Every structure is written in C-alpha cells, then in structure tokens.
Amino acid sequence: GVRQQFSIRENIEIGLYGVDFVKNASQYLSVDNETVDLGWRELGYLFLASAEGQRILSENQQLQSQCGAKIEILNPENLKIKFPWLNIDGIALGSFGYEGEGWLDPSLFLNAFRAKARALGATFLHGEVTEIVKYKQKISSVILDSGVQVGCSFLVNAAGAWAGAVAELAKIRLPVVPKKRIIYGLDCREKLNPKLPLVIDASGVFIRSEGTGFVCGVSPPAHLDPNSWDDMEVDYSLFDEIIWPAIAHRIPAFEAVKVTNAWAGWYDYNTLDQNGVIGPHGEIDNFFFANGFSGHGLQQSPAIGRAIMELITFGEYRTIDLSRFSHERIIRGLALTERNVV
C-alpha cells in the first residue's frame, strides 16, 4: 500500500511523492506510449487509537497535514457515521487518509519498473553476489555465484531482506534481517462494503478489501518473530489466536469468515528502528544503501530511487533531504523511531 500516515516528516514526504508516482505511472513508466495500469485502489488507510494512543495519533495528523497530506481526524461518533460497520468500543480516535492513500498490485509495479529500465538500456543479470572486491576506498567489482565478475563505478545495495548479508561481504555492519510476514485471504459470510479501507486496529491487526474478498495480517509479538531465512510456512494459529479475535471484535461482520488462501513473504527488517538506511557509506566512496524499509519498500521505492540518483548524479539530495536516514546513525546506534508502523 501507499500512505502518508507516518510520524517522521521525511517518511510523509516520501509517501506524498510515492502516491504522485503511482497515480501518474504512465507518465513515469510508459514504454512506447502504452498506458501503465498498476491496479491502484485509492480507498484510504484508517488508523484507530485507544485512549492511550490518541495523543500520538493526533500529533501525527497535525504533522501530516502540515506536509500537505489529506488526513482527517475522526472522533468515535464521526467514525460510526462514516464507517457504520465499525465497532468503536475502546476506540478514542481515528485518522483517515481520504485522498492519496490506497494500494496497488506489486507484481504490476515491479514489471512496469523492469520494462521501463530495459527500455532505457538497463541490463539484468541473474545470480547471487558471493564476493565484493574493493580497491582502496572503492568497490571495484562484484563476483557472482556463476563466477562472472562485474565491474562497477557505483554499487547500490538494494538486496531487500538479504541486504545485511550483502553488506557483510564488504565488511559493513547493517542490521537488516528477513522477518516473515503472513497475509491471509478471507471470505466474509455477511455482505460487507467491498470498498473497505485498510483498517489498522489499535491492536496492530490490519484488514482491507481485496477484489471480492479481504486480506488481513499483523506483525507478530517479538517472541513469535524470529529472523526467518528460509521458513515460508504459513502459521494459521496466528490468525486463529490473534487476528480473528481482533477483526471480529472491531468489525462484527467478520465473526463468520473463512480463510480462502494465505501466503508468506519477507520484510527487510531494520532491527535498530524499522526505518530505511539510505545514502553513501561514510568510508567506501561508491557504496550506497537503499535498505531496511521494514515493509514500506514498495511505497517508498520511487522516492528512494530518485534520492539515490540525486546522490550519484549530483553528490547531494535535490528534492527530499534524507540525511537523517544515513548509515552513520547505524554506526552510532541512534534510532530514528517511526511511530506509525504496520
């Protein structure tokens, strides 16, 4: 999904550019003047807060509005008017992105990027990087598992969940690990509004519409969330014990649901603060980070790609200053904590 409901100004600005990019995808990604369809559904994000979390939610909304995001605060009465299917028990406040928030088809997004890159002359090589070769204070080449050596003027680490392992090849510490996340597809017996926004309950459980059904998930508690290098098994107990009780309480129509499908994938999880690590390495001149987005990678990729381009081309940020996301904070152990993580 794409949203602006963050607590850090840079993340909000990244989200604003992200939605502009998605809504104008044909302008940015078209090849041979073909229309680019990303399956964009602009149905909004609805964050719900208990009494304990309402101050933070309100403060976040003020910052989001200052940045130009279209986010409205709703008290329980207005929540019930706008979303009559919602149980407001235990909810003190909600914030709703009424414009510029929604979701898209990630495979269409990836394929559109790939097609545009190829049209502009990019070459894709398939393989695993097994060695990074340095000469003085620069990366000179990488070696693939096939034995092929690829020279480089710049190396951008955009290895997703395996970014930490790639950085280690250059003897760089990067606290990014794979964390398994599971999405469950649902069919609801009771007829419910097919344009359900992405609802984030105060419990952390989220659910949204998907086609004629719904999808839901949650970031599991720490003791159920180990680093996951090769485990892609779907844990149905997570749905039964945590997700279903929460969504059935918040949206009573979900008391009678059937799990129709489920799948697992990886977050590139930054263990320091769940925020991106962006920009050059302080000592290796041509090594750049685009890592650790902890589930926000798709929506943040347009702005991050532009930022890395600016650094390589101009030696500085020209649009959004992302200096606070530098690798220096990792070295110093200074967390830049985002309060709106899904």
Model region roles, listed by residue range:
Residues G1-K82, G204-F206:
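Dinucleotide-binding Rossmann-like beta1-alpha1 core, especially the glycine-rich loop
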Residues E13-I14, F47-I56, F96-K116, D231-F239:
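Short beta-strand to alpha-helix junction loop
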Residues W40-E42, F124-L125, P175-R181, P252-A264, ...:
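A short coil-to-beta-strand element that immediately follows conserved catalytic motifs
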Residues F96-F154:
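Helical element adjacent to the flavin cofactor pocket in flavoenzyme catalytic cores
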Residues G97-W103, S203, F293-L298:
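Glycine-rich "substrate-gating" loop/helix at the edge of Rossmann-like oxidoreductase active sites
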Residues P106, P245-V342:
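C-terminal catalytic lobe of FAD-dependent flavoproteins
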Residues S146-L196:
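Central helical "cap/lid" subdomain
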